[in-house]
Amino acid sequence: MKSRRKFLKQSILGAGSMAMTPGLFAANAKGKAPKRFIFIHKGNGLLPNTLVPSTLKGVELEKEKRKEAFEVSLDDHELPEWMGALSEHKGEMTILQGLSGKMCTTGHHTWQSSLGAYKANERLSSIKWATVDFELAKLFPSSLEHIELACFPSGGGNSRGNINGIEKGFSARGPQQPNYAFGSPKVAIEELFKSVSGDKESKIQYQLERRLLEFAAMSEGAMAEELRGLEKAKVKNYSDSIESIRERNRKMDAMSDVIRKHAPRLDDKYFADDLNTVDRQIGHAEIALSTLISGMTNVVTLTADELGTIYTGVTDIEKESVNLHDVGHGKPVGKFEALEVREKV
């Protein structure tokens, strides 16, 4: 039997080769395939057995039951039913099981723990360093660096009920620096694609924002020249921050034709304030793909749900409001047992 260390080393190398497969990514304008990353965060996570191919048998199945290390080719097996849409991509896929989560287990709410590999809670001081998605965004830079979208809970958690706004997400830019996530497709499109908006009012607003930033940059720069010591350093930091936003806007303007071409075309229902959870996820996914395809970013993090998320719009139980926390504790919904509900969400 392989040692855990050797097995993990080979598995990670396999995952790395998957990420470098040219066919997975659209080429950019220079013909070079960019590396792109999507992180999906779920409140209840995935039970280990839901990732096991149903066609395992014999020795392999026995090793799986004993939680022993082994490797199989996915080409020789069928993916779990819920992963069926990815069957054509098994050649570029790795399912890596058995990693310990003890370093980031905190209880009911993980905050930045799972992507940061530390025990985070609601206190900013618990954020020890940047999460893995932000580290990758630094290694593979883009105009917007990183985008986070989330289906926030209607009560408590990061958003404190502001599910359609911009609130603390599940990623971190650095120590004590939580990232902010878009809570609805509507606000995400308004903010991310405002530079190519066809709406007259949005165009005016965008130009006003640009002029305000230009004025602020000039004012802060002039003020810094008259100061000394700590005060000068503070003002310079403000000035540098404003200039970084202006530089980002300049990059976005230079990409306007590509962004406009790949901007998401969503039905009106995705802009409603009372959007159901499933449609919210679909809307977020469309926006995430648009930003990746257009090259606005190379890293997207999508929080599909968290424990306080009240699910609506779920197939076969559309009229039910599903409490994800209760499902995690085994509570059935309608005629479906908790495990069946987990499969649906």
Segments and roles (model prediction):
Residues 2-345:
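Ligand-binding pockets and gating/stacking loops
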